[in-house]
Amino acid sequence: MMFEHVLFLSVYLFSIGIYGLITSRNMVRALICLELILNSINLNLVTFSDLFDSRQLKGDIFAIFVIALAAAEAAIGLSILSSIHRNRKSTRINQSNLLNN
């Protein structure tokens, strides 16, 4: 796959994630869009690592760290969403005003 195609795919995934993050009213959908943004960043890291320095694996190792961070973020985010849903009976963003009380 050519370098430009991979960059176009990464920008496309990033823009879909940003659009979904801005327009979503559901917290689960916002979390999925955030994961999509992180995956597009990983795609860029691996692509530029392969293009500029293919013998060293700095970009690939950093991408593995980002994947581990995304997994931890998803686990914590889903547990918080589960707690919010249990207490508020809704996962809509505009209905969760946890800082008012």
Curated annotation (Swiss-Prot):
NDH is composed of at least 16 different subunits, 5 of which are encoded in the nucleus. It comes from the Eukaryota. Signal peptide: none annotated. NCBIfam families: PRK05715.1-2. It is a multi-pass membrane protein. It is found in: Plastid, Chloroplast thylakoid membrane. GO terms for cellular component: chloroplast thylakoid membrane; NADH dehydrogenase complex. The lineage of its organism: Eukaryota, Viridiplantae, Streptophyta, Embryophyta, Tracheophyta. Belongs to the complex I subunit 4L family. It catalyses: a plastoquinone + NADH + (n+1) H(+)(in) = a plastoquinol + NAD(+) + n H(+)(out); a plastoquinone + NADPH + (n+1) H(+)(in) = a plastoquinol + NADP(+) + n H(+)(out). The keyword Metal-binding does not apply. NDH shuttles electrons from NAD(P)H:plastoquinone, via FMN and iron-sulfur (Fe-S) centers, to quinones in the photosynthetic chain and possibly in a chloroplast respiratory chain. The immediate electron acceptor for the enzyme in this species is believed to be plastoquinone. Couples the redox reaction to proton translocation, and thus conserves the redox energy in a proton gradient. Its main location: plastid. This is NAD(P)H-quinone oxidoreductase subunit 4L, chloroplastic. The keyword Ubl conjugation does not apply. It holds the Pfam family Oxidored_q2. The chain crosses the membrane at residues 2-22, 32-52, 61-81. It comes from Hordeum vulgare. Its EC number is 7.1.1.-. HAMAP family: NDH1_NuoK. Keywords: Chloroplast, Membrane, NAD, NADP, Plastid, Plastoquinone, Quinone, Thylakoid, Translocase, Transmembrane, Transmembrane helix, Transport.
